[in-house]
Each structure stands twice: as C-alpha cells, then as structure tokens.
C-alpha cells in the first residue's frame, strides 16, 4: 500500500506521526476508526493551523529544485494575470485567520481562467464545507449548516437573497454567525476563512440593496483572473505543465511575509 502523508480515504496508511503531540495516525479500515483519526486531525487543523500546514507540506525543509520550479510556475501564473506576488502573504494571513475584517478571499473571472485550480489547491489540505448556488436557492435557512465543525469554507458561484445576507456579512467579516440545522437547534458557525470562486462580479439576488453589496465587498479581498489558462503555452519552458497543490503552498510560504 502506498505511503500517504494525510488521510482522505479508508485504507490510507501512515508510517509515523507527522507531529506526535498532535497526531495519532493508524491503519484505517473501518469507518468508525476513520472517524476517530479524522477528529484528531481536524482538531489539529483548527488549534494550530500554521504548524499543521508546515508539517503537511514540509515547508520548513530545504527547498529542492523541484520545489523551486513549482514556485516559479505559480509565480508565472500570477504574473500572467498581473497579480502581484504579495497575494502569497494575503493568502497566508487569510487561511491563518489573521486577515481582520476581510475574512473572504474571492477569485473572479470567466470559465477556463484557472479559478478552480487555485481554489482546489487552497482547500486541498483542509476539512472544508462547500456552498453553491443550488444549496443556497433550495435551502436558504440551512445555507451554512454544512460549515459546522469545518476548517475552511468554499463558496462556488454563491447566490443568495436578503434573508441570509446578514449572516453572510458576519461570516465574511470573521464573526461567528448562526445557522439552522435540519432536525436540530440553531447552531453557531465558528470563525473560518471563506474562499469564493465566481463568474459574477457581484454576489446575491435582486433583493439585496446597494448597501448590502458594498458591505459584502468591504469584507473580501478580490482578485480578477482575467486570462485563459493554457498550460501547454504558459508553462512550455518547465519540465511539467501542471500547477500542483503543494506548489501553491510552497509559493505562499515563500511570499507569506510580503505586504502591499
């Protein structure tokens, strides 16, 4: 069986703890055992987010040539979209919940520009909740119920009406918000980083007023991904033409202290 550094599926195996004081890692065969292991890892994610990421990707190790190439590919991607490398520092402070009242990170652009690639790489190591248009329209009262006990929130093409706007503002500002639970009581959603991927500049339906849109905008950092991603052209001078999850975190780590 292949060696893994994180547990996503039943049967994944750990050879040793990455951080013995925080982890206990086992062969995982039954769902009950899997649940027990995940609880330990999720607790680690939320109590020591920085050390969790450092351990997971080996960010405090000396960089290899492969690591440096992965960083350069992400730098090429951001340069291609005229996004400064200070985005690395923005993403680091955001995921560590150190971004103050701007707790939302939004990537806006047309299909095929690489928004999904960035978002998938960012949420890859986290226990995340996904909120999309269908959920928001069908169950507005329960829009945030899947966010309970998670480490990050991903919103894909979010579209919501006035009835949940105030709770959305709280979530994007880094405040605790409330959600209804099916067959349960109203529950508090803890402060979590919110990642947004959308083809639309504004979020929300016609019931939202100008002041609502302005308040939502003030609670997010927005980046426009404006150029189509064609890896075979953009990365033709590199050994590989794929943007990797680890590469993005290596890029973030390299630029985590950069500020505008």
Residue ranges and their predicted role:
Residues 1-143, 148:
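P-loop NTPase catalytic core of nucleic-acid-dependent motor ATPases
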Residues 95, 123-130, 151, 162, ...:
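Alpha-helix capping/termination and helix-coil
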Residues 153-155:
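Hydrophobic positions in the central parallel beta-sheet of the AAA+
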